């Protein structure tokens, strides 16, 4: 894991009320973090994700994962370093929204 992945895991996701797994194999990919309940994948992106080849690979990967009804959150590494609280709030909001969409009646599953 990168230092950004370690920080997000140990300082936020590891003890998050909704279970997240790290380095989870999903089909032909290994994702950084995955919540089956929220149907969310979190990918932390370093600089290699922003060149032409990286963008193309990420686009293909995201499309593949979205075919299974998963939402992919792509977060630049520098945001984890510079705005950790904002990253956590963003994830929190996306998880809440996803849980509401996956359980519109509000009943516990």
Can you name each region flagged by the protein language model?
Residues 1-109:
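Nucleic-acid endo/exonuclease domains
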């Amino acid at each position: 894991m990168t230092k950004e992945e370690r920080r997000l895991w140990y300082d936020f996701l590891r003890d998050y009320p909704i279970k997240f797994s790290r380095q989870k194999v999903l089909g032909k990919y290994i994702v950084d973090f995955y919540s089956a309940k929220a149907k969310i994948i979190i990918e932390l992106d370093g600089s290699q994700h922003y060149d032409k080849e990286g963008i193309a690979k990420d686009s293909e990967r995201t499309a593949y994962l979205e075919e299974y009804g998963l939402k992919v959150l792509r977060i630049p590494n520098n945001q984890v370093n510079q705005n950790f609280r904002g990253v956590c709030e963003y994830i929190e909001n996306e998880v809440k929204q996803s849980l509401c969409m996956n359980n519109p009646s509000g009943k516990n599953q």
